[in-house]
């Protein structure tokens, strides 16, 4: 029997239920460099003190349970327990608090996003003492970051592989997302790539359905890629969605894509799961494939301000799990995304060191210690009139993806691609000449449209299209 066990045994085991805050609320605790730190938005039930609510979160997401148990005496709770080390009220919200929790690193399996989330956001989100709970941010210590491989390539290596520099990359999601035959699908891919796009994309729910089986789609898309490359002299790609019902089937599809010689595959990382995503990312790393990530199902998890997981946490988890691109919202399109919040998690995806900045929703300083970065993908309800704003907001290290904004062109798919490429080149040139895209954007597009009939036609079609709705997830004032 260890000295520690002997000491506890001599005190005697006291059965019963006690307040969580007696053990798990430790405002005097000084966080360690090796701790995983979490910021939770906590809404306690009426009558539950915020300190008790924060302590309950720390307990239920680490070593605690609802009653004292005899086996507590067989381990060191001080070493392994989570600690709520700070509580602060949320400005402008009644009975809502930010609870800061520190977790010892030994609680987590190395290189496993799955295990990290199972602990931190597992059972605790159904805890009755809380009306609502949201994980706002995580600080991943460098010691834990180093157990992950992360993205296969990183931004600079991807640019080198594609030989594309000095501008955002251009993409298009093939529409309609469901119902096309494989041959017609491949035709649309070819027309878009030939027109000037860098990538085309399977939509998130294109897997292997009766109207288009995955192998047929892969073959016709590969033909489109190689034909468009030969005609344009540019490297092209199509995000072949390898997401499947089993990990084995997913890997079979990724292997076939590699055998075809295409540059990139795709995965729906939330519906597919982090275990599957990490496995696919490791395969892509070993076999020279880029990995595009779609965030299908994210809004179920992150859209409500008081409950769920903020997308900045899901973005950090993806960078750890592995992926070269991930959809990040557009700010200006049809999908949710406030500007400052979006730019906050875009920096968390791309940069190596990000300072704490509550004005952008970043609760902790994050050091990625050279873990490769991820390209944010702006996609959803965007068209040529949005090009100046997108170029200004996201900068060069991004993918701007126009689905309907390419395929909805009145003259067809290839002219739609031409219009987007011309608009992008015009915005990049104007920016490089010192013009302000935020204030002169529309003028820049009109000037370019004078010598591009394809762009002029696109401008006419979408001149009145706007998506002006207030974002659900906003910064605390």
Swiss-Prot record:
The disulfide bond which can form in the large chain dimeric partners within the hexadecamer appears to be associated with oxidative stress and protein turnover. The modification N6,N6,N6-trimethyllysine is found at residue 14. The keyword Plastid applies. GO terms for cellular component: chloroplast. Mg(2+) binds at residues 201, 203-204. Residues 1-2 form a propeptide. It holds the Pfam family RuBisCO_large_N. Binds 1 Mg(2+) ion per subunit. It catalyses: 2 (2R)-3-phosphoglycerate + 2 H(+) = D-ribulose 1,5-bisphosphate + CO2 + H2O; D-ribulose 1,5-bisphosphate + O2 = 2-phosphoglycolate + (2R)-3-phosphoglycerate + 2 H(+). It comes from the Eukaryota. PROSITE patterns: RUBISCO_LARGE (PS00157). GO terms for biological process: photorespiration; reductive pentose-phosphate cycle. InterPro entries: RuBisCO (IPR033966), RuBisCo_large_chain_AS (IPR020878), RuBisCO_lsu_C (IPR000685), RuBisCO_lsu_C_sf (IPR036376), RuBisCO_lsu_fd_N (IPR017443), RuBisCO_lsu_N_sf (IPR036422), RuBisCO_lsuI (IPR020888). The active site is at 175 (proton acceptor), 294 (proton acceptor). The record marks 334 as: Transition state stabilizer. The basic functional RuBisCO is composed of a large chain homodimer in a 'head-to-tail' conformation. In form I RuBisCO this homodimer is arranged in a barrel-like tetramer with the small subunits forming a tetrameric 'cap' on each end of the 'barrel'. RuBisCO catalyzes two reactions: the carboxylation of D-ribulose 1,5-bisphosphate, the primary event in carbon dioxide fixation, as well as the oxidative fragmentation of the pentose substrate in the photorespiration process. Both reactions occur simultaneously and in competition at the same active site. This is Ribulose bisphosphate carboxylase large chain. The gene is rbcL.
């Amino acid at each position: 029997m260890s000295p520690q066990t002997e000491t506890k045994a001599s005190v005697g085991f006291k059965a019963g239920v006690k307040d969580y805050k007696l053990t798990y609320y430790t405002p005097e605790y000084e966080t360690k460099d090796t701790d995983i730190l979490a910021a939770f938005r906590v809404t306690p039930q009426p009558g539950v003190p915020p300190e008790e609510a924060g302590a309950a979160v720390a307990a239920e997401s680490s070593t605690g349970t609802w009653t004292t148990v005899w086996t507590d005496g067989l381990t060191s709770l001080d070493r392994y327990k989570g600690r709520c080390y700070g509580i602060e009220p949320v400005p402008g919200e009644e009975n809502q608090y930010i609870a800061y929790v520190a977790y010892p690193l030994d609680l987590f399996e190395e290189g496993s996003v799955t295990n990290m989330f199972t602990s931190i956001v597992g059972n605790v989100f159904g805890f009755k003492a809380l009306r609502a709970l949201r994980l706002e941010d995580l600080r991943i210590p460098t010691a834990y970051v180093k157990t992950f491989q992360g993205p296969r390539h990183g931004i600079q290596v991807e640019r080198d592989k594609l030989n594309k520099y000095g501008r955002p990359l251009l993409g298009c999601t093939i529409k309609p997302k469901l119902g096309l035959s494989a041959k017609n699908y491949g035709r649309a891919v070819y027309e878009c790539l030939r027109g000037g796009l860098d990538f085309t994309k399977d939509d998130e729910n294109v897997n292997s359905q009766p109207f288009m089986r995955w192998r047929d789609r892969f073959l016709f898309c590969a033909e489109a890629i190689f034909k468009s490359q030969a005609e344009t002299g540019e490297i092209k790609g199509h995000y072949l969605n390898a997401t499947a019902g089993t990990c084995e089937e997913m890997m079979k599809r990724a292997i076939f894509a590699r055998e075809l010689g295409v540059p990139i595959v795709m995965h729906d990382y939330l519906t597919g799961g982090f275990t599957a995503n990490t496995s696919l990312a490791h395969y892509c790393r070993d076999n020279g494939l880029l990995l595009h990530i779609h965030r299908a199902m994210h809004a179920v998890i992150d859209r409500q301000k008081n409950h769920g997981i903020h997308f900045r946490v899901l973005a950090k988890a993806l960078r750890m799990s592995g992926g070269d691109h991930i959809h990040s919202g557009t700010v200006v399109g049809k999908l949710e995304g406030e500007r400052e919040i979006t730019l906050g998690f875009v920096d968390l995806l791309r940069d190596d060191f990000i300072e704490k900045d509550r004005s952008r929703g970043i609760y902790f300083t994050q050091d990625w210690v050279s873990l490769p970065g991820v390209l944010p993908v702006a996609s959803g309800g965007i068209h040529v009139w949005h090009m100046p704003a997108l170029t200004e907001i996201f900068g060069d290290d991004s993918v701007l993806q126009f689905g309907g904004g390419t395929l909805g062109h009145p003259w067809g798919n290839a002219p739609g691609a031409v219009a987007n490429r011309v608009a992008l080149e015009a915005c990049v040139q104007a920016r490089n000449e010192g013009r302000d895209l935020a204030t002169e954007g529309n003028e820049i597009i009109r000037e370019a449209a004078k010598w591009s009939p394809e762009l002029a036609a696109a401008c006419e079609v979408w001149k009145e299209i706007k998506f002006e709705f207030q974002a659900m997830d906003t910064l605390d004032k």
